[in-house]
C-alpha cells in the first residue's frame, strides 16, 4: 500500500533499459476492470471507501498518503449553518487529552447524513468539568445523549480509582459506546474521510461554523513526512480525534473481500 517496497520493485520494472535486456518488467492489473469482479461489488466499494482508498484497492494506484490527513475536507462543501434538532439523538465524541479536553456534538439525520452541530473545548480541564458543561447544555435531552469516548478512558484512573467512563456514568450519562480496544488509527481516519466524501462523490458529513476547533483540526492535521503517522506536534488533532470515535463506531469502513464472479 502506498509507496512501499513493492512500489520500488514495480518502478524498477518500468525501466525501459531493464525491460529491453529482459531482466525486469512490471504491469498494473486494475481490479475494477476485471470481468470476474461483479459491477455491483465495485459500486458498493465506491460508496464505502474514500477516493484515495478506492484508488489504492481497486484501481491499482500507488497512493501517497502524505500531506493532509483529512484530505477530502473543504470548507466550501462541508461547513454550513446547522440547526440542533431536539427530537434527534445527540452523540458526543470525546477525546480525553487534558489540555484541551475536546468534545464534538453530533446528530445523525434521517437521510443518512451526520451533522456536527457544536463542540466543546476546555483547556486545563478534566472529565468532571466536561460532564458539567454537557449537563448544562443538554440536560433537557440527557436521555438522548450517547457518549463515544476514546477507549483509553476506560482504563485511565483518577484519584478515587474511577475511570473517565465511570465519571460520565456517575454524572448521569449512562449511554456510553466504545470498543474494548483502540481501532487502528488508519481505520478511524478512513471512516471520517469516507463520510466527508466517498469514492462515488457522496458527502454525508457536515459541520456548523461554530465548530471552529474541529474545522481547524480537519484542515491542518498532516502526516509526518514519509510515514502514515499523524504529526501531533501542533496539538491540533484532538477535535478530529473526538469526531472519529463515533464516526468509526457507527459508520466503519468495511474490510471488503473480493469474492469474484461474473458481470
Regions found by a protein language model. Give the residues of each.
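Acidic, Mg2+-coordinating catalytic module of metal-dependent nucleases/exonucleases
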Residues: 233-254, 262
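Hydrophobic/aromatic beta-strand patches that form the interior of the parallel beta-sheet core
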Residues: 25-27, 92, 148
Amino acid at each position: 500500500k502506498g509507496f512501499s517496497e513493492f512500489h520500488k520493485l514495480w518502478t524498477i520494472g518500468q525501466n525501459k533499459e531493464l525491460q529491453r535486456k529482459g531482466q525486469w518488467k512490471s504491469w498494473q492489473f486494475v481490479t475494477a476492470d476485471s470481468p470476474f469482479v461483479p459491477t455491483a461489488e465495485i459500486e458498493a466499494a465506491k460508496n464505502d471507501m474514500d477516493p484515495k482508498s478506492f484508488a489504492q484497492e481497486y484501481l491499482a494506484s500507488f497512493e501517497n498518503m502524505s500531506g493532509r490527513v483529512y484530505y477530502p475536507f473543504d470548507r466550501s462543501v462541508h461547513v454550513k449553518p446547522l440547526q440542533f434538532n431536539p427530537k434527534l439523538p445527540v452523540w458526543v465524541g470525546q477525546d480525553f487529552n487534558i489540555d484541551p479536553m475536546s468534545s464534538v456534538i453530533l446528530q445523525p439525520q434521517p437521510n443518512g447524513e451526520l451533522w456536527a452541530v457544536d463542540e466543546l473545548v476546555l483547556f486545563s480541564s478534566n472529565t468532571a468539568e466536561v460532564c458539567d458543561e454537557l449537563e448544562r447544555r443538554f440536560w433537557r435531552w440527557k436521555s438522548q445523549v450517547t457518549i463515544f469516548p476514546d477507549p483509553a478512558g476506560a482504563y485511565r484512573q483518577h484519584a478515587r480509582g474511577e475511570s473517565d467512563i465511570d465519571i460520565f456514568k456517575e454524572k448521569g450519562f449512562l449511554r456510553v459506546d466504545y470498543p474494548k480496544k483502540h481501532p487502528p488509527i488508519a481505520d478511524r481516519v478512513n471512516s471520517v474521510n469516507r463520510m466527508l466524501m466517498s469514492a462515488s462523490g457522496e458527502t454525508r458529513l457536515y459541520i456548523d461554523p461554530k465548530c471552529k476547533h474541529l474545522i481547524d483540526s480537519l484542515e491542518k492535521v498532516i502526516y509526518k513526512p514519509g510515514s502514515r503517522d499523524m504529526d501531533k506536534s501542533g496539538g491540533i488533532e484532538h477535535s478530529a480525534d473526538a469526531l472519529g470515535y463515533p464516526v468509526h463506531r457507527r459508520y466503519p469502513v468495511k474490510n471488503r473481500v473480493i469474492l469474484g464472479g461474473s458481470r
